[in-house]
Amino acid sequence: FPAMPLSSLFANAVLRAQHLHQLAADTYKEFERAYIPEGQRYSIQNAQAAFCFSETIPAPTGKDEAQQRSDVELLRFSLVLIQSWLGPLQFLSRVFTNSLVFGTSDRVYEKLKDLEEGIQALMRELEDGSPRAGQILKQTYDKFDTNLRSDDALLKNYGLLSCFKKDLHKAETYLRVMKCRRFVESSCAF
């Protein structure tokens, strides 16, 4: 992220977050279609809900709660969510070797790193200093399991993809709330 106006930094971060959230949703759907029998999907989704460690972060759970937090807090939460996936995503491409959506999985890590840098640039602008994000939580998700012949591995990966999708949705929401708060525009209704 080169030096640019704050409005551009926010616009770029929101676009990156939206793109990553869409990739995560597409990846989740493709994995589900390929590996999870239709009759099992709903019950598995309910069981997976409790396994996202990001639920332990005292972060807002929706747009209304996010609007009650400061921009710096929302940036910190977003950064923690993004950083918790950097490790696991390095293994994503090994799991999905012959798949169309997953053909982009090598780039997902780079896109996540770009978003991390964008959030850090926003934090520097808003905090007038270097980011201190590690103070909230320095936990990360397990890596994806490459053994797709094991039911346990399939369920683990399905749960991880579900958490990845949820976490990117949160980060996207936080960034959009901040952008709308600072730069009122027609695209603020979401």
From Swiss-Prot:
Taxonomic lineage: Eukaryota, Metazoa, Chordata, Craniata, Vertebrata
PANTHER family named in the record: SOMATOTROPIN, SOMATOTROPIN,PROLACTIN
Function description: Plays an important role in growth control. Its major role in stimulating body growth is to stimulate the liver and other tissues to secrete IGF1. It stimulates both the differentiation and proliferation of myoblasts. It also stimulates amino acid uptake and protein synthesis in muscle and other tissues.
Presence of the UniProt keyword RNA-binding in the record: no
Family, as annotated: Belongs to the somatotropin/prolactin family.
Superkingdom of the source species: Eukaryota
Subcellular localization(s) per the UniProt record: Secreted
Coiled-coil spans in chain: none
Molecular function per GO: growth factor activity; growth hormone receptor binding; hormone activity; metal ion binding
One Gene Ontology CC term in the entry: extracellular space
Matching PROSITE patterns: SOMATOTROPIN_1 (PS00266), SOMATOTROPIN_2 (PS00338)
Keywords: Disulfide bond, Hormone, Metal-binding, Phosphoprotein, Secreted, Zinc
Matches recorded under SUPFAM superfamilies: 4-helical cytokines
UniProt-recorded name of the protein: Somatotropin
Entry annotated with the keyword Disulfide bond: yes
Gene field: GH1
Modified residues (Phosphoserine): 105
UniProt main location, coarse: secreted
InterPro entries: 4_helix_cytokine-like_core, Somatotropin, Somatotropin/Prolactin, Somatotropin_CS
Disulphide bonds in the chain: 52-163, 180-188
Swiss-Prot/TrEMBL GO biological process terms: animal organ development; growth hormone receptor signaling pathway; positive regulation of growth; positive regulation of receptor signaling pathway via JAK-STAT; response to nutrient levels
Binding, Zn(2+): 19, 172
